[in-house]
Curated annotation (Swiss-Prot):
Summary of the tissues where the protein is detected: Expressed mainly in adult and embryonic kidney. Expressed at various levels in immune tissues, with the highest expression in the lymph node and spleen.
Gene from which this protein is expressed: SUMO4
Propeptide stretch(es), residue numbers: 94-95
Assembly, per entry: Interacts with SAE2. Covalently attached to a number of proteins.
Organism listed in the record: Homo sapiens (Human)
Protein name stated in the entry: Small ubiquitin-related modifier 4
Length: 95
């Protein structure tokens, strides 16, 4: 029975994780597993770096609202399998 309690604690710990989808403008969807209390900057960097993008060039939105790197899934009341939309910030322009 003593072994059962740590197993239950591990299950509770797994509830601290959330699976999030990040949807790009090109229709691609990437899934991330992140702790509910982890700042979203970690997810943002993990999305941008393999694509050769700077976090400063990209805008992340959840439910139509902009999110920042200091936001956490728990703060934004994100649920498992929620989707974060990614938009490339327009740069420059000639008139």
């Amino acid at each position: 029975m003593a072994n059962e309690k740590p197993t239950e604690e591990v299950k509770t710990e797994n509830n601290n994780h959330i699976n999030l989808k990040v949807a790009g403008q090109d229709g691609s969807v990437v899934q991330f597993k992140i702790k509910r209390q982890t700042p979203l900057s970690k997810l943002m960097k993990a999305y941008c770096e393999p694509r050769g993008l700077s976090v400063k060039q990209i805008r992340f939105r959840f439910g139509g609202q902009p999110i920042s790197g200091t936001d956490k899934p728990a703060q934004l009341e994100m649920e498992d399998e929620d989707t974060i939309d990614v938009f490339q910030q327009p740069t420059g322009g000639v008139y």
